[in-house]
């Protein structure tokens, strides 16, 4: 998840060379006086949040690393609307009390620790970008990248905006049972459109010899995860969450609606826009 950082030599590296006077002898330089660094508190804004103090979970690669291969993921980016975050904050606090060993997806911080500070919970968990997967996350070779991206862009060149409603709390387990997820699923509004887009991605995957998506796809965003298969815990937790949600909201289900506006293809650390619908 962390971006790779590349170090480049400065264009002004030569400025650090000793000056040369006539005759070729280097001119002696005065020893510089090193000042002590300023207090760290002065370098931090008033609303600074130190996320490094929060316990982190263990990361597990979902497929073996192969030299020369890059992880491919095609998805719809989702940002939770501000008007839905207050209720979700309450729900995630409830989830953390029901399943203490949950972690925030991608951020990988312990949910129970995040819940101690509302600012941390909203910034680390709810303020990030989520995704609805349109294809399996698989490894591809470098020579496949250009062809795959070009075909995806051609497939999705005439997409239109539509609504997605994440209306059902559900739990999922990955293929090798190393992780379980607490998720919000799309079961009504937006399901036909997303299912069609998954089929289109499958067609491109098939042409590149890649495994297709699940036979009966269930579009969702995952908010938290736990190590191993904890289906029984999460199944019971989703029932309790629905009861809790009904007690604080007159509507029957979670009212999280987002507009579809973009599809992204991530290969390794590089992100390609497949389609983007303007306002």
Write out the residue ranges for each language-model feature:
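Histidine-dependent nucleotide/RNA phosphoesterase domain, centered on the 2H-phosphoesterase fold
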Residues: 2-279
């Amino acid at each position: 998840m962390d971006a790779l950082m590349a170090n480049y030599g400065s264009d002004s590296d030569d400025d650090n060379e000793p000056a040369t006077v006539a005759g070729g002898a280097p001119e002696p330089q005065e020893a510089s006086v090193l000042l002590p660094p300023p207090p760290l508190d002065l370098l931090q804004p008033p609303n600074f949040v130190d996320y490094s103090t929060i316990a982190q979970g263990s990361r597990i690669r979902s497929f073996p690393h192969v030299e020369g291969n890059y992880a491919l993921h095609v998805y719809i980016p989702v940002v939770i609307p501000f008007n839905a975050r207050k209720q979700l904050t309450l729900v995630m606090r409830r989830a953390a009390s029901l399943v203490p060993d949950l972690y925030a997806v991608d951020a990988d911080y312990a949910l129970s620790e995040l819940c101690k500070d509302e600012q941390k919970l909203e910034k680390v968990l709810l303020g990030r970008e989520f995704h609805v997967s349109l294809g399996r996350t698989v490894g591809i070779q470098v020579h496949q990248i250009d062809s795959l991206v070009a075909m995806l862009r051609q497939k999705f060149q005439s997409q239109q905006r539509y609504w997605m409603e994440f209306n059902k709390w559900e739990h999922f387990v990955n293929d090798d049972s190393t992780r379980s997820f607490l998720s919000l699923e799309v079961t009504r509004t937006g399901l036909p459109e997303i299912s069609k887009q998954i089929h289109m991605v499958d067609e491109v995957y098939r042409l590149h010899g890649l495994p297709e998506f699940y036979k009966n796809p269930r579009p969702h965003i995952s908010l938290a995860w736990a190590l191993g298969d904890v289906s029984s815990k999460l199944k019971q937790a989703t029932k309790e969450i629905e009861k809790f949600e009904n007690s604080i909201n007159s509507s029957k289900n979670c009212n999280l609606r987002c507009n579809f506006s973009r599809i992204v293809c991530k290969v390794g650390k590089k992100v390609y826009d497949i389609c983007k619908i303007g306002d």
